[in-house]
Amino acid sequence: MVLWIGVDDTDSLQGMCTTFLATEIVRELTDDYDLIGYPRLVRLNPNIPWKTRGNGAISIRMGRGRGPIQTLGGIGGRPVRSYLRGDSPRDVKDLVAKVARCVERLSRFEDPMTNPAFVVLNKPAAPSLYWKAVRGVVGQRTALAAVRGRATVRRYKSGRGVIGACAATAWRPRDRTYEVLTYRHPDRWGTERWIDPDSVIRMDRRFPSTFNNYDYENERVVIAPHSPCPVLFGIRGDDPSVLPAAMATVNGEVPDRWLIFETNQGTDDHVSPHSAPQAGTTVRIRGDVRSAPRVLPGGHVVLRIGDMDATAYEPSKQFRTLVKALDVGDRVQAIGAVRRLPWTLNIEKLNVEFVALVQRKVGNPWCARCKRRAKSTGHKQGYRCPRCRTRFPMSAGTFVQVERKLKPGWYEPPVGSRRHLSKPLKRMWLEKAETLVESRRSSERSTLELRDLAEFRDPGPDTAARPTR
């Protein structure tokens, strides 16, 4: 067995990054211990109100390595190498002391919202803890109970970071992505980053397995954060083998160090399946549009889907144009976070399943007896001839069909407006393509097996093998 290290809640809005602390832990430990597998960046419930930024915790496995070796990064001019498998190190106390020094040296203790913690486990927490933490709210007692008897725990201040630290070790990937994170020289922290946008565009087009690199709709580089943290840029993708080359394609400020993380970003792990909407969760709702979209002050667009309001907020940019194109009768599936005040679904992705026929009234019905137009008797109350008082139903008006450009299919906000955990449509299409290819391969294998079976002939007793002379 290897040792599992989990760390969380060390950064703040004013600086630091828990992944940078991970690089320091790796640098401190790899003189005496071996890195096993990829370090992990595990995003948890994005709707937690007390999160600092992206609600990401880290998990690192250390031990005595064995098996194949791969290079995952570079720190201090030295390559970071990782083993596929490993055994437990002998000196656990020394490892704990080194992790503690890193956490205590780099955590932003002065920030009232920062409450660091770390755990060192001889066995990771059960996967159920991860699913609770990525989809709901977990307390410290629950997290500590999940690692009781197998952990060294250090909590600082309120110790709230122990929740993410334990949950990060509990992640067993059903789906995964990777991110190569590059970091700035310490003397440049807090200054403006310089990254050549054209090189980011070239990288995005050259490496199709990467995603969320550049916002073409708003002409904005997305791989670089805007906070004063140590991160220079990060490139996310499905194939970790291409990430070093993708990193080298980006021109600009020279990184001080880099490291590839295995992550749950872009997986939709935060979406609760088959659950009723609850505040602070991310759910999937399906229903008919029951009210025409309306624009609120600030540019937010709200409409009613089934029995719930759904909103495309201003930061979703051009995505609001799609939402405004919906109309009563359209059938949609929406994925989003449930807000308590106001009670609404903050739309992350939208699947238009059916586009309704929409008609617009261009005239009131004609009274054939009086040769004049009938008048409306009120909202949805029909019509009445002002002379002979003959009544007409609503359907008697003159209508024309409205041309609608909206097409069925999935839609998402621009690259720069997406959440860390939200699965990009690009990944959804890739998964569907892979499933289709595998289905065809299975079909071809089945066809070959049937063909082989048809060609098989039982030799029978007359053609039994005879002894050779």
What are these regions (language model features)?
Residues 69-276:
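Long, hydrophobic alpha/beta structural blocks
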Residues 241-299, 322, 351-361:
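OB-fold nucleic-acid-binding modules
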Residues 284-290, 328-343:
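Flexible glycine-rich surface loops and low-complexity tracts that mediate binding to linear polymers
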Residues 291-316:
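OB-fold (S1/OB) nucleic-acid-binding surfaces
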Residues 317-333:
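Short nucleic-acid-contacting surface segments enriched for D/E, G, S/T with interspersed K/R
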Residues 337-366:
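OB-fold/S1-family single-stranded nucleic acid-binding modules
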Residues 367-370, 385-388:
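Short cysteine-rich clusters marking metal-coordination/redox-active sites
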Residues 398-469:
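Long, charge-rich boundary regions
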